[in-house]
A protein has these predicted regions:
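Active-site-adjacent structural elements that line small-molecule/cofactor binding pockets in enzymes
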Residues: 1-168
Length: 168
């Protein structure tokens, strides 16, 4: 699934609307499942994280050109970026679109952590999530072992399933 989703938009717009729907239906957070959401960029160190952020430029420029996602950009003060990307898309300037997205834009929309920080990050910042997913290199036996170790730690993270401040 592609698109633009940020933790801020999730917390300020989406989850409050889900809460309203739950209240109207007489249901509770435990009646639904929410997958971990928002751009989360994970790497071994700041350099790898920055490279992965920069690798998101093409996708963000494409989705950001689509007016459907301008509300997410607006939440972050990036509405002008969305308008510029849309105009460039109408002109077929795909490379220029990618180059329009800056590292500052990416840092505004994404959250980052290292692989070692991931379990703590999920517990502190994705407390609403019933499910989480992540990717990392698994091409060698050592990488696979590291992945399995991190996977066990992530699976051990207990979350409330209730967004902070949106209890029913």
């Amino acid at each position: 699934h592609g698109g633009i989703m940020s933790d801020r938009y999730m917390r300020e717009v989406l989850l409050p609307n889900v809460r309203t729907g739950l209240q109207r239906a007489g249901r509770d957070w435990s009646d639904i499942e929410i997958s971990e959401s928002g751009y989360l960029v994970i790497g071994d160190d700041d350099s790898e994280i920055e490279q992965k952020l920069l690798g998101m430029r093409r996708a963000l420029s494409f989705y950001g050109s689509t007016r459907t996602y301008h509300e997410v950009l607006r939440t972050h003060g990036l509405e002008e970026l969305g308008q510029k990307l849309h105009a460039l898309s109408l002109q077929g300037k795909w490379e220029e679109m990618r180059d329009t997205v800056t590292l500052d834009d990416l840092n505004e929309l994404a959250q980052t952590c290292t692989y070692d920080e991931l379990p703590q990050f999920l517990g502190e910042h994705r407390e609403y999530a019933s499910r989480s997913g992540f990717g990392m290199p698994r091409g060698t036996p050592a990488e696979e072992e590291r992945f399995q170790d991190l996977l066990a730690k992530v699976q051990a993270v207990e979350t409330s399933g209730v967004p902070k401040g949106l209890e029913l």
